C-alpha cells in the first residue's frame, strides 16, 4: 500500500512541479502547488480507497507531498528532491529512496498530467491548487 501511495504522491508531485499558460509546453515548468483530480481511470481512487494528494514543487528542486487514503485519518507528509530532464520528472525521497517511477509531464492551462514509465502506465491528473493550511497543520511524517 505504501508503494502504491508513494506512486500516487510522486505523480502528484510531478504534476505540481509544472506550470504553464494556456497551451502545452514541450518542457513544462513544475514549480507550484497541485491537487490530484484522478489516477488512471479511477476518480482519485486506488483500488476502492479514496485518495487525496497535494504536491508542492519548489523552484530549488525540493518537493513536499501530502497524501491521505481512505484508511488514513490524516495526511502523511513526504519530502525530497525532484528534477525535470527533457520532459521527464524523477525524484528521490528524503530517506534516499527513489520514486517508484519516473513520469512524463504534460501541462495544459491549470491541469498537469503525469504518466509513469512503469508498465502498465499510471496516469495521474492534477489541478493547480493552493495547499490548505489545515492539510499542512494536520500532516504527520510516515
Spell out what each predicted region is.
Residues 18-79, 85-142:
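Lipid interaction determinants
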